[in-house]
């Protein structure tokens, strides 16, 4: 359905005139609105992923909470957007859910493609640190992102040095009342996320925990440096079991993973991925240590 021209009424009774379609993905379509600062994200209510996003926005992404966390951690920027409003729209046969969210600029995937599918190491390390800061905030609220990738990292419209991790349709609550979710497989959750970057735990049907997001970020940084992961082409065939098995082969052999992917082994990624692979499912990472490792790649 094309929503352009429709007038949507949100939960606060404000009206939004839907403009042209500017993006479409696995978790909804994105349209401009009559206010250039915002876009509207729409999908059928039955799909459920926008409800997951809406719940995450309302429970976790409160501006006051983010600001307080930034001050307490001495971190200048957390790349998470907030939700302006939400609501439902009913057509003749289908009911739709919509969110009104901040309008951003180009995504990182477009930037990488415009640079011959390769970014300088310094840029990759800086992006890695930004995403690390962002997922640390999420993790300390008890949530994992579950789908970190270049197309879900978006530049600010004005300040191109600010990045945002978007698309919260696969967020998972791995902590509840101070207790970590148990290490129990759910066959219905197997292989969630983007196959090339899905963490091994998710392949097996476990809820993505902190180590899963960090693992995915490691795979992404290899790709942003221009590398081709050993399972990249297999991912295109949608053979989930073979992708999972191939990833498992490299868990204890990070140097080989890097040499196979990049033809060299950057010290920072060698240390980063090795440390990720040493984490247990329940373990809280030492984010400062991960930041320090990546920061070495910024200056050396």
From Swiss-Prot:
EC number(s) on file: 2.7.11.1
**Which catalysed reactions does the entry list for this protein?**
L-seryl-[protein] + ATP = O-phospho-L-seryl-[protein] + ADP + H(+); L-threonyl-[protein] + ATP = O-phospho-L-threonyl-[protein] + ADP + H(+)
What this protein needs as a cofactor is: Mg(2+)
SUPFAM superfamilies in the record = Protein kinase-like (PK-like)
Start and end of every Protein kinase domain? Answer: 16-282
Q: Output the Gene Ontology terms for molecular function.
A: ATP binding; protein serine kinase activity; protein serine/threonine kinase activity
Q: Where is the active site?
A: 147
Localized where?
Virion; Host cytoplasm
The cross-references to Gene3D superfamilies, in alphabetical order and at most eight, read: Transferase(Phosphotransferase) domain 1
Gene Ontology cellular component annotations, sorted alphabetically? host cell cytoplasm; virion component
Q: What induces it?
A: Expressed in the early phase of the viral replicative cycle.
Which annotated residues bind ATP? 22-30, 45
Consult the record and explain the modifications the protein receives after translation: Autophosphorylated.
| Swiss-Prot/TrEMBL keywords | ATP-binding, Early protein, Host cytoplasm, Kinase, Magnesium, Nucleotide-binding, Phosphoprotein, Serine/threonine-protein kinase, Transferase, Viral release from host cell, Virion
Q: What does this protein do?
A: Essential serine/threonine-protein kinase that plays different role in the viral life cycle. Phosphorylates the host small ribosomal protein RACK1 thereby customizing the ribosomes to a state optimal for viral mRNAs (which contain poly-A leaders) but not for host mRNAs. Facilitates viral DNA replication by inhibiting host BANF1, a cellular host defense responsive to foreign DNA. Phosphorylates host BANF1 on serine and threonine residues; this leads to BANF1 relocalization to the cytoplasm, loss of dimerization and impaired DNA binding activity.
> What's the family?
Belongs to the protein kinase superfamily. Ser/Thr protein kinase family. Poxviruses subfamily.
* Complex and partners: Interacts with host JIP1; this interaction increases the amount of MAPK bound to JIP1 and subsequently increases the activity of transcription factors, such as JUN, that respond to these complexes. Interacts with protein OPG198; this interaction inhibits the repressive activity of OPG198 pseudokinase on viral replication factory formation.
- By what name is this protein known? B1 kinase
């Amino acid at each position: 359905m094309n929503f352009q021209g429709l007038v949507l009424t949100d939960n606060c009774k404000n009206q939004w005139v839907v403009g042209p379609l500017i993006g479409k993905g696995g978790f909804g379509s994105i349209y401009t609105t009559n206010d250039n600062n915002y876009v509207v994200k729409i999908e059928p209510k039955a799909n459920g992923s926008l409800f997951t996003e809406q719940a995450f926005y309302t429970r976790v992404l409160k501006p006051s909470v983010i600001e307080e966390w930034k001050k307490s951690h001495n971190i200048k920027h957390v790349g998470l957007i907030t939700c302006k409003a939400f609501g439902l729209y009913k057509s003749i046969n289908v009911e739709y859910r919509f969110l009104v969210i901040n309008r951003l600029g180009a995504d990182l995937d477009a930037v990488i493609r415009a640079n011959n599918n390769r970014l300088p190491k310094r840029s990759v390390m800086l992006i890695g640190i930004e995403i690390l800061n962002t997922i640390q905030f999420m993790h300390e609220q008890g949530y994992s992102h579950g789908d970190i990738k270049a197309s879900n990292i978006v530049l600010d419209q004005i300040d191109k040095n600010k990045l945002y991790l978007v698309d919260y349709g696969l967020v998972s609550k791995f902590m509840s009342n101070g207790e970590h979710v148990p290490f129990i497989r759910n066959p219905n959750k197997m292989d969630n996320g983007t196959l090339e970057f899905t963490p091994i735990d998710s392949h097996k049907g476990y809820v993505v925990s902190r180590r899963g997001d960090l693992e995915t970020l490691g795979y992404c940084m290899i790709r942003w440096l221009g590398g081709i992961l050993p399972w990249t082409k297999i991912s295109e065939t949608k053979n989930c079991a073979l992708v999972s098995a191939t990833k498992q082969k490299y868990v204890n052999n990070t140097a080989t993973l890097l040499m196979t992917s990049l033809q060299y082994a950057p010290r920072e990624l060698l240390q980063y991925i090795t440390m990720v692979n040493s984490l247990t499912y329940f373990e809280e990472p030492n984010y400062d240590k991960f930041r320090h490792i990546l920061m070495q790649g910024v200056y050396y």
